Amino acid sequence: TTVIEQSYFYNKERTSKMLKQLALTTALIASFGTAHAYQAEIGGTIAVVDPDHGDTSTGFALDGTYYFNPVQVKNNPLNEAAFLNRSSNLNGEVSYIDYDVYEVTAFNVGLEYFIPNSDFYLNGNIGQTKHEADGVEDLDTTIYSAEVGYLPVPGLLIAAGLLGYDNDYGDDVDPTLRAKYVTQVGAYDMNFEGGASFGDIDAYSFGTDLYLDKTLSVGLGFSDTDGKDADVFTIRAKKFFTQQVSLEGAIDFADDGNVFGLRGAYRF
């Protein structure tokens, strides 16, 4: 027998203690992973617009979210942890795309607030989009929205609000409705979401995501605008390689072209 085997057979009590310590350490590490919390997320996106008629364009975006309190992942799908924890946050995004004949720069800041010790929810956003082209005056459009929501059961949000815009050519404000529901269907977690705005031109969107496990989702989406050939069909997927690092992709199939998007993000 080897020295290692002799040590094992002649020191059973010591070996037993070591195995117990190893089991305890493994369980402790697992509990750390389950209870991991984060308080911010930053992401970067690249998008390729491939129109049916015209040249391909590329756009870029940066986004960030700061949560007022650490988000506890628990046993939730990683992508839905903040929503299921009702985590209030500040968020923002800036994007740029060059269509050759003109450029579009946009930014947006928002606040999501889950009112403590209640089932009510508030959401507000304001942003601006700038269109720039040679030989013409820049067009700046301010876009804003506000919502009041209610969560009647865990995982379900129903919200109503207003969506408006204002630029040199006009302004408008339309009422909106939105719902989001994260629940378990059979052995899988699923996300269902939908929204609509009502005005001179109605718009609506629907989407669903299937979580194959807590780190991986695949989903479908559809959006359309009343009175225009503006329907968009979306295929999307997202994967968390760790509890901090994620990568997601989407393809939008539209009437006049396709958009391919890829986003990487980091939580801390």
Question: Which role fits each region the language model picked out?
Answer:
Residues 4-26, 30-268:
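Outer-membrane beta-barrel proteins
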